[in-house]
Amino acid sequence: MAVLAAVTSPLEAQASAGSTEWDASARAGYAFLGRLCDDFGGRLVGSRQNRRALERLAEELSALGLKPEFQTFTMPGWERRVDSVTMLSPLNRSLRVAALSYSNPHSPFRADVVDIGKGAAADYPSGAKGKVGLLSAGTGLQTSEVVAIAKDHGLRAILFINREAGGQLLTRTGSFTGKALPLPVYSITQEEGLWIGRLLARGEAVRVEVRTTSRCVDVETANLVVRLAGRSPDKVIVGGHFDSWDLGQGAIDNGLGVAQLFALAHALRDRPLARTVEIVWFNGEEMGLWGSRHAAKVLGADPVIAMVNLDMVGVPIAINALGDDSLVPALERFQAGREVKLPKGVENVNWMGSDHTSYQLAGIRAVTFNAPIDREAVRYYHDFADTIDKLPERIVVDSTAIIADAVLSLVNDPGLRPFRRDAKETDDLFSRFGIDRRMKATGLWPTH
Protein backbone atom coordinates (compact mmCIF):
# COMPACT_ATOMS: atom_id res chain seq x y z
CA MET A 1 0.00 0.00 0.00
CA ALA A 2 2.92 2.33 0.44
CA VAL A 3 3.03 5.43 -1.75
CA LEU A 4 6.69 6.29 -2.31
CA ALA A 5 7.81 9.88 -2.11
CA ALA A 6 10.48 9.39 -4.77
CA VAL A 7 9.93 6.96 -7.61
CA THR A 8 11.70 8.50 -10.56
CA SER A 9 15.31 7.38 -10.10
CA PRO A 10 16.36 4.93 -12.84
CA LEU A 11 17.43 1.51 -11.65
CA GLU A 12 20.96 2.10 -12.87
CA ALA A 13 21.32 5.14 -10.59
CA GLN A 14 20.26 3.40 -7.41
CA ALA A 15 22.89 2.63 -4.80
CA SER A 16 24.46 -0.78 -5.23
CA ALA A 17 25.67 -2.72 -2.24
CA GLY A 18 28.04 -4.81 -4.37
CA SER A 19 28.78 -8.44 -3.51
CA THR A 20 27.99 -9.14 0.15
CA GLU A 21 27.50 -11.99 2.59
CA TRP A 22 23.74 -11.61 2.07
CA ASP A 23 23.69 -12.30 -1.68
CA ALA A 24 22.85 -16.02 -1.58
CA SER A 25 19.98 -15.42 0.83
CA ALA A 26 18.65 -12.55 -1.27
CA ARG A 27 18.72 -14.68 -4.40
CA ALA A 28 16.85 -17.40 -2.53
CA GLY A 29 14.24 -14.81 -1.57
CA TYR A 30 13.88 -13.63 -5.15
CA ALA A 31 13.57 -17.17 -6.48
CA PHE A 32 10.88 -17.90 -3.89
CA LEU A 33 8.96 -14.78 -4.93
CA GLY A 34 9.07 -15.85 -8.57
CA ARG A 35 7.47 -19.17 -7.68
CA LEU A 36 4.91 -17.46 -5.47
CA CYS A 37 3.84 -14.97 -8.15
CA ASP A 38 3.64 -17.46 -10.99
CA ASP A 39 2.00 -20.26 -8.99
CA PHE A 40 -0.67 -18.24 -7.18
CA GLY A 41 -1.07 -14.81 -8.80
CA GLY A 42 -2.57 -12.02 -6.70
CA ARG A 43 -2.88 -12.63 -2.96
CA LEU A 44 -6.12 -10.88 -2.02
CA VAL A 45 -6.69 -11.49 1.68
CA GLY A 46 -9.35 -14.12 2.30
CA SER A 47 -8.94 -15.68 -1.14
CA ARG A 48 -7.91 -19.26 -1.86
CA GLN A 49 -4.79 -17.95 -3.62
CA ASN A 50 -3.74 -16.02 -0.53
CA ARG A 51 -4.23 -19.01 1.76
CA ARG A 52 -2.36 -21.42 -0.51
CA ALA A 53 0.47 -18.94 -1.06
CA LEU A 54 0.87 -18.45 2.70
CA GLU A 55 0.97 -22.20 3.18
CA ARG A 56 3.70 -22.41 0.52
CA LEU A 57 5.70 -19.75 2.38
CA ALA A 58 5.39 -21.76 5.60
CA GLU A 59 6.50 -24.94 3.81
CA GLU A 60 9.60 -23.32 2.33
CA LEU A 61 10.56 -21.71 5.63
CA SER A 62 10.15 -25.06 7.37
CA ALA A 63 12.45 -26.62 4.78
CA LEU A 64 15.12 -24.18 5.97
CA GLY A 65 14.80 -25.57 9.49
CA LEU A 66 12.70 -22.66 10.73
CA LYS A 67 9.47 -22.96 12.72
CA PRO A 68 6.92 -20.57 11.20
CA GLU A 69 3.77 -19.96 13.21
CA PHE A 70 0.36 -19.02 11.82
CA GLN A 71 -1.12 -16.12 13.78
CA THR A 72 -4.80 -16.56 12.94
CA PHE A 73 -7.36 -13.76 13.14
CA THR A 74 -10.73 -12.75 11.73
CA MET A 75 -11.24 -9.48 9.86
CA PRO A 76 -13.83 -7.74 7.71
CA GLY A 77 -13.00 -9.01 4.25
CA TRP A 78 -14.22 -8.39 0.75
CA GLU A 79 -14.70 -10.60 -2.28
CA ARG A 80 -14.38 -9.28 -5.83
CA ARG A 81 -17.02 -10.62 -8.16
CA VAL A 82 -18.26 -9.41 -11.55
CA ASP A 83 -18.81 -5.64 -11.55
CA SER A 84 -19.42 -3.31 -14.45
CA VAL A 85 -20.00 0.29 -15.45
CA THR A 86 -21.37 0.68 -18.97
CA MET A 87 -21.71 3.99 -20.77
CA LEU A 88 -25.16 4.20 -22.37
CA SER A 89 -24.91 7.66 -23.91
CA PRO A 90 -23.58 9.43 -25.86
CA LEU A 91 -22.00 6.07 -26.84
CA ASN A 92 -22.54 2.50 -25.76
CA ARG A 93 -19.26 1.33 -24.24
CA SER A 94 -18.12 -0.96 -21.45
CA LEU A 95 -15.78 1.12 -19.27
CA ARG A 96 -12.62 -0.32 -17.71
CA VAL A 97 -13.23 -0.15 -13.96
CA ALA A 98 -12.39 -1.93 -10.73
CA ALA A 99 -14.43 -1.61 -7.56
CA LEU A 100 -12.75 -0.38 -4.39
CA SER A 101 -12.96 -2.84 -1.52
CA TYR A 102 -16.01 -2.78 0.72
CA SER A 103 -18.22 -1.79 -2.21
CA ASN A 104 -21.30 -3.94 -1.69
CA PRO A 105 -23.94 -5.48 -3.99
CA HIS A 106 -26.91 -3.43 -5.16
CA SER A 107 -29.61 -3.67 -7.78
CA PRO A 108 -28.37 -2.50 -11.20
CA PHE A 109 -29.26 1.11 -11.89
CA ARG A 110 -28.94 3.75 -14.58
CA ALA A 111 -27.99 7.34 -13.84
CA ASP A 112 -26.42 10.45 -15.31
CA VAL A 113 -22.82 11.34 -14.48
CA VAL A 114 -21.91 14.63 -12.80
CA ASP A 115 -18.43 16.11 -12.32
CA ILE A 116 -17.70 16.52 -8.59
CA GLY A 117 -14.16 17.85 -9.01
CA LYS A 118 -11.98 16.88 -6.06
CA GLY A 119 -14.95 15.68 -4.03
CA ALA A 120 -15.27 18.55 -1.54
CA ALA A 121 -18.77 19.81 -0.82
CA ALA A 122 -17.96 23.11 -2.55
CA ASP A 123 -17.14 21.21 -5.77
CA TYR A 124 -20.64 19.80 -6.18
CA PRO A 125 -22.99 21.29 -8.76
CA SER A 126 -26.65 21.63 -7.94
CA GLY A 127 -28.85 18.68 -8.77
CA ALA A 128 -26.30 15.96 -8.00
CA LYS A 129 -28.78 13.78 -6.13
CA GLY A 130 -29.34 10.40 -7.76
CA LYS A 131 -26.36 10.72 -10.08
CA VAL A 132 -22.93 9.13 -10.42
CA GLY A 133 -20.02 11.38 -9.40
CA LEU A 134 -16.84 11.72 -11.48
CA LEU A 135 -13.97 12.30 -9.03
CA SER A 136 -10.67 13.93 -9.99
CA ALA A 137 -7.41 12.04 -9.48
CA GLY A 138 -6.14 15.15 -7.72
CA THR A 139 -8.35 14.87 -4.66
CA GLY A 140 -6.58 15.32 -1.35
CA LEU A 141 -9.41 13.76 0.62
CA GLN A 142 -9.46 10.30 2.13
CA THR A 143 -11.93 7.90 0.51
CA SER A 144 -14.01 7.95 3.70
CA GLU A 145 -14.33 11.74 3.43
CA VAL A 146 -15.24 11.60 -0.26
CA VAL A 147 -17.88 8.94 0.39
CA ALA A 148 -19.42 10.80 3.34
CA ILE A 149 -19.81 13.97 1.27
CA ALA A 150 -21.17 11.97 -1.68
CA LYS A 151 -23.74 10.31 0.55
CA ASP A 152 -24.84 13.69 1.92
CA HIS A 153 -25.39 14.89 -1.66
CA GLY A 154 -27.35 11.78 -2.61
CA LEU A 155 -24.92 10.29 -5.12
CA ARG A 156 -25.46 6.67 -6.11
CA ALA A 157 -21.87 5.82 -7.11
CA ILE A 158 -18.43 7.37 -7.65
CA LEU A 159 -16.01 6.98 -10.56
CA PHE A 160 -12.50 7.80 -9.30
CA ILE A 161 -10.14 8.79 -12.14
CA ASN A 162 -6.76 7.06 -11.97
CA ARG A 163 -3.64 9.20 -11.60
CA GLU A 164 -1.63 7.04 -14.06
CA ALA A 165 -2.19 7.00 -17.82
CA GLY A 166 -2.09 3.96 -20.08
CA GLY A 167 -5.40 2.30 -19.28
CA GLN A 168 -4.39 1.61 -15.69
CA LEU A 169 -6.58 1.19 -12.65
CA LEU A 170 -5.77 1.76 -8.99
CA THR A 171 -7.41 -0.85 -6.82
CA ARG A 172 -7.43 0.26 -3.22
CA THR A 173 -9.37 -0.04 0.01
CA GLY A 174 -12.59 1.85 0.38
CA SER A 175 -12.57 1.72 4.18
CA PHE A 176 -10.06 1.29 7.00
CA THR A 177 -12.93 0.43 9.36
CA GLY A 178 -14.14 -2.57 7.37
CA LYS A 179 -17.67 -1.22 7.11
CA ALA A 180 -19.53 -1.63 3.83
CA LEU A 181 -19.52 1.52 1.73
CA PRO A 182 -22.93 3.22 1.47
CA LEU A 183 -22.40 3.54 -2.30
CA PRO A 184 -20.06 1.76 -4.73
CA VAL A 185 -16.76 3.42 -5.61
CA TYR A 186 -14.92 2.50 -8.79
CA SER A 187 -11.45 3.21 -10.09
CA ILE A 188 -11.73 4.25 -13.75
CA THR A 189 -8.91 4.66 -16.25
CA GLN A 190 -7.47 8.13 -16.68
CA GLU A 191 -8.29 8.09 -20.38
CA GLU A 192 -11.97 7.21 -19.98
CA GLY A 193 -12.37 9.42 -16.92
CA LEU A 194 -10.94 12.48 -18.66
CA TRP A 195 -13.04 11.73 -21.73
CA ILE A 196 -16.20 11.73 -19.64
CA GLY A 197 -15.06 14.97 -18.02
CA ARG A 198 -14.60 16.64 -21.41
CA LEU A 199 -18.05 15.52 -22.51
CA LEU A 200 -19.61 16.94 -19.35
CA ALA A 201 -17.70 20.22 -19.75
CA ARG A 202 -19.24 20.57 -23.23
CA GLY A 203 -22.70 20.08 -21.80
CA GLU A 204 -23.13 16.54 -23.13
CA ALA A 205 -25.25 14.22 -21.03
CA VAL A 206 -23.35 11.09 -20.00
CA ARG A 207 -25.46 8.21 -18.74
CA VAL A 208 -24.17 4.94 -17.30
CA GLU A 209 -25.44 1.65 -15.97
CA VAL A 210 -23.78 0.40 -12.78
CA ARG A 211 -23.78 -3.21 -11.61
CA THR A 212 -21.94 -4.28 -8.44
CA THR A 213 -21.89 -7.87 -7.21
CA SER A 214 -18.67 -7.78 -5.16
CA ARG A 215 -19.45 -8.21 -1.50
CA CYS A 216 -18.27 -7.72 2.05
CA VAL A 217 -17.69 -10.93 3.99
CA ASP A 218 -15.85 -11.71 7.22
CA VAL A 219 -12.76 -13.83 6.59
CA GLU A 220 -10.40 -15.87 8.72
CA THR A 221 -6.81 -15.37 7.70
CA ALA A 222 -3.37 -15.35 9.31
CA ASN A 223 -0.07 -13.61 9.65
CA LEU A 224 3.02 -15.80 9.47
CA VAL A 225 5.68 -15.34 12.15
CA VAL A 226 9.26 -16.62 12.44
CA ARG A 227 11.04 -16.01 15.75
CA LEU A 228 14.82 -16.14 15.88
CA ALA A 229 15.77 -16.26 19.55
CA GLY A 230 18.58 -14.04 20.76
CA ARG A 231 20.50 -13.88 24.01
CA SER A 232 18.04 -11.22 25.16
CA PRO A 233 14.24 -11.40 24.98
CA ASP A 234 14.24 -7.79 23.79
CA LYS A 235 13.04 -7.99 20.22
CA VAL A 236 13.42 -6.24 16.91
CA ILE A 237 10.34 -6.85 14.77
CA VAL A 238 10.80 -6.86 11.00
CA GLY A 239 7.61 -7.05 8.98
CA GLY A 240 5.97 -6.43 5.66
CA HIS A 241 2.62 -7.27 4.17
CA PHE A 242 2.07 -10.56 2.40
CA ASP A 243 -1.28 -9.80 0.79
CA SER A 244 -1.73 -7.92 -2.45
CA TRP A 245 -4.50 -6.80 -4.74
CA ASP A 246 -5.91 -9.35 -7.11
CA LEU A 247 -5.56 -7.88 -10.60
CA GLY A 248 -1.83 -8.58 -10.95
CA GLN A 249 0.72 -10.71 -9.10
CA GLY A 250 1.59 -8.21 -6.37
CA ALA A 251 5.30 -8.43 -7.20
CA ILE A 252 6.24 -4.84 -6.36
CA ASP A 253 3.50 -4.34 -3.77
CA ASN A 254 4.49 -6.14 -1.76
CA GLY A 255 6.16 -9.21 -3.15
CA LEU A 256 9.37 -7.25 -2.86
CA GLY A 257 8.93 -7.11 0.92
CA VAL A 258 7.93 -10.79 1.02
CA ALA A 259 11.21 -11.68 -0.71
CA GLN A 260 13.29 -9.43 1.56
CA LEU A 261 11.76 -11.00 4.67
CA PHE A 262 12.38 -14.49 3.28
CA ALA A 263 15.99 -13.51 2.58
CA LEU A 264 16.38 -12.17 6.11
CA ALA A 265 15.01 -15.38 7.65
CA HIS A 266 17.28 -17.41 5.36
CA ALA A 267 20.36 -15.38 6.32
CA LEU A 268 19.82 -15.14 10.08
CA ARG A 269 18.53 -18.64 10.80
CA ASP A 270 21.85 -20.00 12.11
CA ARG A 271 23.38 -16.74 13.27
CA PRO A 272 23.92 -15.96 16.99
CA LEU A 273 21.88 -12.87 17.85
CA ALA A 274 22.20 -10.45 20.75
CA ARG A 275 18.46 -9.73 20.67
CA THR A 276 15.49 -11.69 19.40
CA VAL A 277 14.38 -11.02 15.83
CA GLU A 278 10.72 -11.53 14.99
CA ILE A 279 9.96 -11.67 11.26
CA VAL A 280 6.30 -11.18 10.34
CA TRP A 281 4.45 -11.46 7.04
CA PHE A 282 1.24 -9.51 7.67
CA ASN A 283 -2.06 -10.26 5.98
CA GLY A 284 -4.84 -7.79 5.26
CA GLU A 285 -2.68 -4.67 4.94
CA GLU A 286 -4.26 -3.60 1.68
CA MET A 287 -7.75 -3.72 3.17
CA GLY A 288 -6.79 -1.61 6.18
CA LEU A 289 -3.70 -2.81 8.09
CA TRP A 290 -5.68 -5.63 9.70
CA GLY A 291 -2.83 -8.09 10.19
CA SER A 292 -0.43 -5.63 11.76
CA ARG A 293 -3.19 -4.22 13.95
CA HIS A 294 -3.76 -7.75 15.26
CA ALA A 295 -0.05 -8.46 15.67
CA ALA A 296 0.55 -5.22 17.58
CA LYS A 297 -2.42 -5.97 19.83
CA VAL A 298 -1.31 -9.48 20.80
CA LEU A 299 2.24 -8.29 21.57
CA GLY A 300 1.04 -7.20 24.97
CA ALA A 301 3.90 -5.80 27.04
CA ASP A 302 6.69 -7.62 25.17
CA PRO A 303 9.95 -5.61 25.24
CA VAL A 304 10.39 -4.16 21.74
CA ILE A 305 13.33 -2.12 20.50
CA ALA A 306 11.66 -1.11 17.24
CA MET A 307 9.59 -2.37 14.32
CA VAL A 308 11.14 -2.25 10.83
CA ASN A 309 8.57 -2.01 8.02
CA LEU A 310 9.37 -3.34 4.53
CA ASP A 311 6.64 -2.12 2.20
CA MET A 312 7.80 -1.50 -1.38
CA VAL A 313 11.37 -0.86 -0.25
CA GLY A 314 13.75 -0.56 -3.19
CA VAL A 315 17.48 -0.01 -2.71
CA PRO A 316 17.71 2.35 0.30
CA ILE A 317 19.23 5.80 -0.06
CA ALA A 318 18.29 6.72 3.52
CA ILE A 319 16.98 5.15 6.71
CA ASN A 320 13.95 6.78 8.32
CA ALA A 321 13.14 6.98 12.06
CA LEU A 322 9.51 7.84 11.19
CA GLY A 323 9.32 10.73 13.63
CA ASP A 324 10.79 9.02 16.68
CA ASP A 325 13.62 11.30 17.80
CA SER A 326 14.92 8.68 20.26
CA LEU A 327 15.83 6.38 17.37
CA VAL A 328 17.87 8.93 15.43
CA PRO A 329 21.16 8.48 17.36
CA ALA A 330 21.09 4.71 16.82
CA LEU A 331 20.40 5.15 13.11
CA GLU A 332 23.22 7.66 12.88
CA ARG A 333 25.53 5.08 14.48
CA PHE A 334 24.41 2.61 11.83
CA GLN A 335 25.17 5.12 9.07
CA ALA A 336 28.54 6.05 10.58
CA GLY A 337 29.56 2.40 10.70
CA ARG A 338 28.83 1.74 7.03
CA GLU A 339 31.74 1.54 4.62
CA VAL A 340 29.41 2.72 1.83
CA LYS A 341 27.21 5.47 3.26
CA LEU A 342 23.54 5.82 2.38
CA PRO A 343 23.44 8.89 0.08
CA LYS A 344 20.79 10.71 2.13
CA GLY A 345 21.80 9.32 5.51
CA VAL A 346 19.24 9.41 8.31
CA GLU A 347 15.78 10.91 7.88
CA ASN A 348 13.07 11.42 10.49
CA VAL A 349 9.76 11.94 8.70
CA ASN A 350 6.55 10.20 9.70
CA TRP A 351 3.86 9.08 7.25
CA MET A 352 0.84 6.83 7.56
CA GLY A 353 -0.93 4.05 5.73
CA SER A 354 1.34 1.02 6.07
CA ASP A 355 1.98 -1.55 8.78
CA HIS A 356 4.33 0.61 10.85
CA THR A 357 1.28 2.76 11.67
CA SER A 358 -0.26 -0.10 13.66
CA TYR A 359 2.85 -0.39 15.82
CA GLN A 360 3.10 3.36 16.27
CA LEU A 361 -0.47 3.32 17.58
CA ALA A 362 0.70 0.74 20.15
CA GLY A 363 3.48 3.11 21.24
CA ILE A 364 6.25 1.17 19.50
CA ARG A 365 8.99 2.93 17.57
CA ALA A 366 9.22 2.19 13.86
CA VAL A 367 11.83 2.37 11.13
CA THR A 368 11.63 2.22 7.36
CA PHE A 369 13.72 3.33 4.40
CA ASN A 370 13.73 5.97 1.71
CA ALA A 371 14.20 3.49 -1.11
CA PRO A 372 13.01 4.58 -4.57
CA ILE A 373 11.79 2.12 -7.17
CA ASP A 374 12.04 2.85 -10.89
CA ARG A 375 8.90 4.62 -12.07
CA GLU A 376 8.44 2.20 -14.96
CA ALA A 377 7.98 -0.57 -12.39
CA VAL A 378 6.22 1.17 -9.53
CA ARG A 379 3.60 2.85 -11.71
CA TYR A 380 1.87 -0.52 -12.14
CA TYR A 381 1.28 -1.22 -8.46
CA HIS A 382 -2.28 -2.25 -7.58
CA ASP A 383 -2.99 -3.12 -11.22
CA PHE A 384 -2.71 -5.94 -13.75
CA ALA A 385 0.92 -5.25 -14.67
CA ASP A 386 2.38 -5.55 -11.14
CA THR A 387 4.15 -8.75 -12.16
CA ILE A 388 7.45 -10.44 -11.37
CA ASP A 389 9.02 -9.33 -14.67
CA LYS A 390 8.95 -5.73 -13.35
CA LEU A 391 11.24 -6.65 -10.45
CA PRO A 392 14.91 -7.34 -11.29
CA GLU A 393 16.75 -9.71 -8.96
CA ARG A 394 19.38 -7.01 -8.42
CA ILE A 395 16.92 -4.86 -6.45
CA VAL A 396 16.27 -7.68 -3.98
CA VAL A 397 19.98 -8.44 -3.68
CA ASP A 398 21.14 -4.85 -3.17
CA SER A 399 18.27 -3.87 -0.88
CA THR A 400 18.58 -6.97 1.31
CA ALA A 401 22.25 -6.22 2.01
CA ILE A 402 21.38 -2.80 3.44
CA ILE A 403 18.24 -3.95 5.24
CA ALA A 404 20.05 -6.86 6.91
CA ASP A 405 22.87 -4.59 8.06
CA ALA A 406 20.33 -2.15 9.51
CA VAL A 407 18.46 -4.91 11.34
CA LEU A 408 21.67 -6.27 12.84
CA SER A 409 22.64 -2.76 13.90
CA LEU A 410 19.39 -2.50 15.88
CA VAL A 411 19.91 -6.01 17.26
CA ASN A 412 23.46 -5.31 18.43
CA ASP A 413 23.35 -1.64 19.49
CA PRO A 414 23.96 -1.51 23.29
CA GLY A 415 22.65 2.04 23.43
CA LEU A 416 19.08 0.97 22.66
CA ARG A 417 16.49 -0.11 25.23
CA PRO A 418 12.88 -1.28 24.83
CA PHE A 419 10.61 1.74 24.69
CA ARG A 420 6.89 2.53 24.50
CA ARG A 421 5.44 5.99 23.92
CA ASP A 422 2.45 7.09 25.96
CA ALA A 423 -0.77 8.19 24.25
CA LYS A 424 0.14 11.88 24.34
CA GLU A 425 3.51 11.24 22.71
CA THR A 426 1.81 9.17 20.02
CA ASP A 427 -0.68 11.97 19.38
CA ASP A 428 2.23 14.37 18.94
CA LEU A 429 3.89 11.95 16.51
CA PHE A 430 0.93 12.29 14.15
CA SER A 431 0.13 15.97 14.64
CA ARG A 432 3.75 17.11 14.36
CA PHE A 433 3.96 15.74 10.83
CA GLY A 434 0.53 16.92 9.74
CA ILE A 435 -1.00 13.48 9.28
CA ASP A 436 -3.47 13.75 12.15
CA ARG A 437 -6.37 14.75 9.87
CA ARG A 438 -5.80 11.76 7.60
CA MET A 439 -5.45 9.44 10.60
CA LYS A 440 -8.78 10.65 11.96
CA ALA A 441 -10.44 10.34 8.56
CA THR A 442 -9.43 6.69 8.28
CA GLY A 443 -10.82 5.91 11.74
CA LEU A 444 -7.48 4.50 12.91
CA TRP A 445 -6.89 7.27 15.46
CA PRO A 446 -7.39 8.51 18.12
CA THR A 447 -7.58 5.27 20.07
CA HIS A 448 -8.25 6.80 23.48
Task: Name what the model sees in each region.
Residues L11-G65, R227-A229, D436-H448:
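N-terminal hydrophobic or amphipathic helices/low-complexity stretches enriched
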Residues A17-S47, Q71-F73, L169-G174, G178, ...:
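N-terminal capping segment at the start of a domain
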Residues L91-Y124, S175-A251, A263-H266, A274-T276:
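Soluble metallo-hydrolase cores and metallopeptidase-like ectodomains found primarily
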Residues L61-S62, A137, A150, I158, ...:
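Alpha-helical metal-binding/catalytic segments enriched in His/Glu/Asp
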Residues A17-D23, D38-R48, V113-I116, L134-L141, ...:
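Second-shell loop/turn segments in exported
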Residues S62, V185, R231-P233, D246, ...:
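Metal-dependent peptidase/peptidase-like ectodomains
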Residues H266, A377-H448:
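His/Asp/Glu-rich mid-to-C-terminal helical/loop segments that flank catalytic regions of hydrolases
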Residues D23, G34, D38-V132, L141:
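Noncatalytic luminal/extracellular "stalk/propeptide" segments of secretory-pathway proteins
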